[in-house]
């Protein structure tokens, strides 16, 4: 699938090849591409380190309103690379148990950064999303799949657990507990068609339409209030963690009051409807 004009490239950790690309295909949209197509964009540390760096940079790029995350070539990501895991930084002189802890911490950080990113993240799942690749997709705010994509919680097939990188937390919240139990305990493939039906993805589209579909969603979100979008993302995620409806409603109310009282966005929306034009939100008084 072709990628658009590259405005910035984040170099790979070990290789001279750029294993993570940051591009700007449309105004206010950043596209982050896992660029290791010969390994289906597997999650080697040589990819995860620059991905973490790219996310940190994009989060504070005020020209970016929405992020699209995808993979180069035929795959989104098949998860761990068991043949070429890459190099974990800052592990000199550590014992194997501590080395393992640092490795898992790095992968966990990537998942959490997607959730904490200031901008909404759309996962453009262009092929297999397996194991850790499924976790990456679930950490995004919105998922759109190409027709050739499929999903698998692969740990159970490898004699391990299927629980990794937040999967046992994220998947039940996305599709319900019974379906999550069945998918994680059987390790079976979930097609793009089924993923759309059960709510694992928002929609599936023909392969050649995937990026344009994601850009269209991103462009719509980019037209709204920046703090409105950011606070809505925050409250959606905090709602998944909320201990009670009452506590969450208070957090929602404070966010709504913040934007209502500190900006003229609502007045602009009312005026725009009366004048039959698109609103222009300044996020200011």
UniProtKB/Swiss-Prot annotation:
It catalyses: a (3S)-3-hydroxyacyl-CoA = a (2E)-enoyl-CoA + H2O; a 4-saturated-(3S)-3-hydroxyacyl-CoA = a (3E)-enoyl-CoA + H2O. It is an enzyme of class 4 (lyase). GO terms for biological process: fatty acid beta-oxidation. One of its GO terms (cellular component) is plasma membrane. One of its GO terms (molecular function) is enoyl-CoA hydratase activity. InterPro entries: ClpP/crotonase-like_dom_sf, Enoyl-CoA_hyd/isom_CS, Enoyl-CoA_hydra/iso, Enoyl-CoA_hydra_C. Could possibly oxidize fatty acids using specific components. Belongs to the enoyl-CoA hydratase/isomerase family. This is Probable enoyl-CoA hydratase EchA12. It comes from Mycobacterium tuberculosis (strain ATCC 25618 / H37Rv). The lineage of its organism: Bacteria, Bacillati, Actinomycetota, Actinomycetes, Mycobacteriales. The gene is echA12.
């Amino acid at each position: 699938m072709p990628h658009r004009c590259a405005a910035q490239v984040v170099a790979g950790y070990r290789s001279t090849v750029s294993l993570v690309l940051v591009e700007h295909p449309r105004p206010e949209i950043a596209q982050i591409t896992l660029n290791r197509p010969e390994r289906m964009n597997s999650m080697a540390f040589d990819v995860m380190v620059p991905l973490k760096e790219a996310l940190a940079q994009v989060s504070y790029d005020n020209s970016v309103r929405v992020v699209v995350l995808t993979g180069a070539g035929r795959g989104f990501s098949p998860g761990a690379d068991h043949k070429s895991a890459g190099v974990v930084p800052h592990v000199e002189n550590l014992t194997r148990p501590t080395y393992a802890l640092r490795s898992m911490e790095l992968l966990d950080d990537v998942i959490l950064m997607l959730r904490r990113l200031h901008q909404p993240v759309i996962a453009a799942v262009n092929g297999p999303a397996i194991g850790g690749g499924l976790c990456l997709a679930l950490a995004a705010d919105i998922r759109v799949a190409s027709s050739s994509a499929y999903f698998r919680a692969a740990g159970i097939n490898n004699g391990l657990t299927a629980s990794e990188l937040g999967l046992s937390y994220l998947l039940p919240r996305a599709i319900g507990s019974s379906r999550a139990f069945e998918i994680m305990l059987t390790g079976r493939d979930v097609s793009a068609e089924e993923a759309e039906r059960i709510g694992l993805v928002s929609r599936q589209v023909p392969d050649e339409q995937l990026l344009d579909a994601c850009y269209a969603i991103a462009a719509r979100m980019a037209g709204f209030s920046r703090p409105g979008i950011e606070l809505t993302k925050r409250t959606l995620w905090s709602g998944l963690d909320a201990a009670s409806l009452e506590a969450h409603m208070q957090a929602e109310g404070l966010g709504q009051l913040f934007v209502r009282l500190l900006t003229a966005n609502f007045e602009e929306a009312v005026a725009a409807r009366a004048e039959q034009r698109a609103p222009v939100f300044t996020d200011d008084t």
